[in-house]
């Protein structure tokens, strides 16, 4: 039941986030990213030159006014926990502000870890109840987007909803990777199908389907009741998309929230930006898109900053080598602590402390932190994992057969290089 008598949107935008807690589901492995997630959870994967993927959901919370956040972790959580402790410990607990880490601990005397997204929330129910929130915002920690959750909260309250699901149109041939819904003219969800083999099209647009973004808002008491019921339901997989949302839809209690209503953009002429960087191609492309002249995702928007752990690094440096060749870059992102010596970097992303030695050409490549590229190397359409040392004279990305033998080459021709792969050469 809505307790706010004042329905003024500006007032609600201030009040509703204060009465809310956000739970970020950050335990996913991200297996489609191959060896990039062999030692880290997908939300902890580096993105955009200096960030981690989870920084986007966390920053959206703070910018939306939600300052009570739980992060639910499981798979390979050390890197993620370390990042949050170092970069997100500035909130004031005395003001009831926090980022609370909730690792899988078999808290309910069960013999299993988190079995599904709903089970991950259920196993922390005693902690979540103590937050004493009126609304619970469930978020995925592995997507790239900027969104004002307070606008979705207002939509949730104004509709009198028990559950609200954020949604956006996606190409129908890609929709089988998402939960897909059908809605009426008032955005009431009529049907919800999790990853259907034949996704239903949107009315009047046969090439598009309406997909769930994995973002849900629940009235807290209603959510707690649902979770209790789901845990005692035979055959349930204890997953929001597979079990809870279809059940709520059947009860006519789930509403859709179009992403266009809460998407944050500095250029309204650009389409709403949301990316599931779950494959190597998608991850590579989303990183390089940021180096374009006018990227769809504006990382320079002071009104909606993306926060992260900031290391005390010197500025990037471009120097000439002993022969006089100058280090130079074009259409690229180069982070602090990088040194490019007598080499050319084109349309690439260099994370902190990358060193590119003389006579190299780096083209359309993502270099994660602490990579060292030896002299006279050529790298094209690559993702080089953290702390890799590329031997002098190595060429990657020009010979598909050779790349497939030494490294991992995706169907789209993106080459992933890790330290383990290099150690076997």
Curated annotation (Swiss-Prot):
It holds the Pfam family NTP_transferase. Alpha-D-glucose 1-phosphate binds at residues 114, 179, 194-195, 212. GO terms for biological process: glycogen biosynthetic process. The keyword rRNA-binding does not apply. It catalyses: alpha-D-glucose 1-phosphate + ATP + H(+) = ADP-alpha-D-glucose + diphosphate. GO terms for molecular function: ATP binding; glucose-1-phosphate adenylyltransferase activity. The keyword Ribosomal protein does not apply. Its EC number is 2.7.7.27. SUPFAM superfamilies: Nucleotide-diphospho-sugar transferases, Trimeric LpxA-like enzymes. Pathway: Glycan biosynthesis; glycogen biosynthesis. InterPro entries: ADP-Glc_PPase, ADP_Glu_pyroP_CS, GlgC_bac, GlmU/GlgC-like_hexapep, NTP_transferase_dom, Nucleotide-diphossugar_trans, Trimer_LpxA-like_sf. Gene3D superfamilies: Hexapeptide repeat proteins, Spore Coat Polysaccharide Biosynthesis Protein SpsA, Chain A. Keywords: ATP-binding, Carbohydrate metabolism, Glycogen biosynthesis, Glycogen metabolism, Nucleotide-binding, Nucleotidyltransferase, Transferase. Coiled coil: none annotated. NCBIfam families: glgC, PRK00725.1, PRK00844.1. Homotetramer. HAMAP family: GlgC (MF_00624). Involved in the biosynthesis of ADP-glucose, a building block required for the elongation reactions to produce glycogen. Catalyzes the reaction between ATP and alpha-D-glucose 1-phosphate (G1P) to produce pyrophosphate and ADP-Glc. Belongs to the bacterial/plant glucose-1-phosphate adenylyltransferase family. This is Glucose-1-phosphate adenylyltransferase. It comes from Serratia proteamaculans (strain 568).
